[in-house]
Curated annotation (Swiss-Prot):
Listed transmembrane segments: none
Protein known as: DNA repair protein RecO
Cellular component terms (Gene Ontology): bacterial nucleoid
Highest classification ranks of the organism: Bacteria, Pseudomonadati, Thermodesulfobacteriota, Desulfovibrionia, Desulfovibrionales
Keyword annotations: DNA damage, DNA recombination, DNA repair
InterPro entries reported in the protein's UniProt record: ARFGAP/RecO, DNA_rep/recomb_RecO_N, NA-bd_OB-fold, RecO, RecO_C
Taxonomy, superkingdom: Bacteria
Amino acid sequence: MDFTDQALVLRVGRFREADLWVRFLCRQRGIISAFAFGGCRSRRRFCGCLDIFNVVLMRVQGTRGGLYQSLQEATLLKGPDRLRRDWRRYGVAVNCLRFIEALGAGPDGADSAFTLTLEMLELLETVDVVPPLLPLLFRARFAFEQGYAPRFESCASCGEPFDGTAKDGGARFHVRDGVLYCGRCSAPTGATVAISRETLDALRFVQDNSPLRWSELCFSPTGRRECSRAVDGFIQYHIGLTWENGTFRRL
């Protein structure tokens, strides 16, 4: 099957002398891999655009037996500059892309995943100060977009809207069920994480707003710890991924 699609280059590898394999996040099809035969040499077909973080318009051809896909042509639509020159920003971006690869994205969630990732890269390209929890917040939002969204609106037991204030004893985030319990209600057996008003507001903000606005968030040390525990616990339980020794590992 032949198709044309916009895509973000997630990873590039070399095989044989002049050929490349490329992993893309496509706007319509999600994550795919394709071989770029002659990709190291062909300026006419690929114009030097097969670099990580580049957004391209690509034309792909499937083999007759469906064993692999061959990249026929690619045109550069957009590529970062500052991101490539700042190794800290580069590292944050790579961490986010590795999570995308580890979790995966199919056709159903492709458009939202594509848009979210481009907004994350634009934030890294343009913002003066990178949000310190950006990789964690991106993992949370990407998982939410792929169907793993928890419920932060109200207590899962009594149903009362929850604002996380101290008068009701704070909140507990139930990792397994992805819901909140107020201080007056008992949570079921299972791992829970304390959630303050600050952390709850931040997670709601991330869930509802573009990454381009995440630099507005400001965390206290306590808020950082709570957010990290809640997001890491949720992703480990529901997706089975943990960041270890520079890579995402399946539990």
